[in-house]
Amino acid sequence: GVAWAANKLGQKSVVFMPKGSTEYRRKQIENEGATVTIEDFNYDECVRLATKKSKEVPNGVVVQDTAWEGYEEIPNWIMQGYGTMAMETANQLEADNCKVPTHVFVQAGVGSLAGSVVGYFTNLYSNVAKKPKLIVVEAAAAACLYKGAVADDGKPRIVEGDLETIMAGLACGEPNTVSWDILRNHADVFVSAPDWVARLG
C-alpha cells in the first residue's frame, strides 16, 4: 500500500521488511518503485529502523500502522481506512440478509486492523440484544495482545525474539497502543494460534 501510494504521488519510498519475508513479496513491492530490503530483524525492529532512517533524510515520514507515544496520527488514519473494510463487510452481510453475525474473527499483528474491526462492530451492534462475539486471532509466536489479555491488568505486553511463524504479516511483538485500548475493552476472546492452524487454512 505505501509503495503503491508513493508511486502514484511521485514520491520516494523505502520499505524495510522483516526476516522471513519472501523474495516474491519483496519484488512485488519493489515493482511499485520502492527501495526494498529484507532485514535480519523482526517486524518491530524494522519499524524502529524505518523510524531512525526517516529522521536522516529531509522530509522523511514514517507511514506505519503501529502506534506508540508521540506517533499516533498516521496510525489513526490507517485504522480509519481499515474501518472502511469493516463497513464494507457489514454492508455485504446485510445484503446477504445477515442482520447480526454470531461471531466476528479478525487477525492481529500489532492490532490495528483488529482494533478497527472490533471498534466498528462494537459500535454498529451496540443496540442489539444478542451481540456478536468479537474474536482476535494472533500467531502464537507473537501473541502480544493475547498475553496482555491474559495478564488482565489493562497493560499491553511485548513479545520479543525472532517471532518465527508462517503467518509472516502477523509476526509483530509490540501492540499498537491506540488499538490496544479498543481491544482490551471490547474484544470478547483472544486466540493464540500455532502455525498448524494456519496451515489447515
How would you describe each model-predicted region?
Residues 10-25, 103, 124-141:
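Short, acidic/small-residue loops that bind anionic groups at enzyme active sites
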Residues 1-53, 145-158, 179:
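Active-site-proximal loop->helix
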